[in-house]
């Protein structure tokens, strides 16, 4: 499962090498998980699954302990970050794009989402299979990107996690 992250590292290395060899002003943006209004209803990522459960009034069922922690970024914030990097970033530098205030575990995110539509009356359950390893879930990890370097260019995330979910759920509800 690490091929995705390793692939990103290789591409970043190739860009840096090409930039040095051919004097191209490459700037790298490392985006955290990004979402917001407009995500497809059938998107397979965990944040979309949680939103669908809220919309459909189904309990959120976790098949792990939900201890993995990540940071997230709202789509529009990600776009403004990319524009900031293009306009003000230094060639040869990498910038993390994330809202550092959104760091949350999968379990706590499920709890957050379960309370966004109180009328749904959904709960968070854990149904951890005995043969968990055979399901291919990522190991528990903490992925907290630090966007301080990007903020020093004048960028600031504007949408928090709860509002990200409120907008996502509203958007997904329109197509459900």
Outline where the language-model segments fall.
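Active-site loop-to-helix junction immediately N-terminal to the catalytic Tyr of the SDR YXXXK motif
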Residues: 1-3, 17, 42
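Short coil/turn segments at alpha/beta junctions that flank glycine-rich nucleotide-binding fingerprints
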Residues: 7, 21-25, 88
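Hydrophobic alpha-helix immediately C-terminal to the catalytic Tyr-X-X-X-Lys motif of short-chain
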Residues: 10, 14, 18, 50, ...
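C-terminal substrate-binding subdomain of Rossmann-fold SDR/epimerase-dehydratase oxidoreductases
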Residues: 54, 58-176
